Amino acid sequence: MEIVSAAARDYHTRPDMKFHPFIALRAAPEFAGAIAAPPYDVVDRAESRQWAERNPRCFLRVSRPDLEFPDATPPDDPAVYRRAAERFAQFRAEGWLIRDTGPAFYLYRIADAAWEQRGVVGVCVVSDYESGAIRRHEKTRAAPEADRIRHTEAINANAGPVLLAWPGDPRVAALCAEAERGEPLYAIRRPDGVRHTIWHFSRSEPLAELFG
């Protein structure tokens, strides 16, 4: 399934956005199943504790560090962000996260028995969001925005993806199909039956040219 938003109708009349390969800090393959976790904002503190229970490698310990604090501790307490930085440093020091040697794009597919969707993983720039080249697709609240800003500053990394929709291009689809024929970096099946598969594009140049 290709994701297309209503904003796609005037895509070609809007300023071109920049989308680049990047040097990823990603899960070591042998630990990927333990590290994989739901997005921080779809589980509450109690649920995140259940995910992280007896699993020191659960990434919610980085993305939702308030799980390690008493319920009376506000999620935006400075100590919570310090804990995020500590856990992120631990994940790197233990070798649970590894740094790629060069910039690349990645293909991410999510699927179950009834549906599937794909996305190319890369980096965009904040100035494109500010200029309107990237259109907002929802109204967000100030408090959660401030929380993620502080979290990003604390760990000096993006702990989760920002999802963008675009009209699509058959040339990009062909490159994605080619990548899917290769060996994936990760193939994880969650208890709910959803399969998460990620491939590394062996060459970034063709995609970089198409994305501009």
Task: Give residue ranges: language-model regions.
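A cross-family signal for N-terminal binding/gating loops and helix N-caps
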Residues: E2-G212
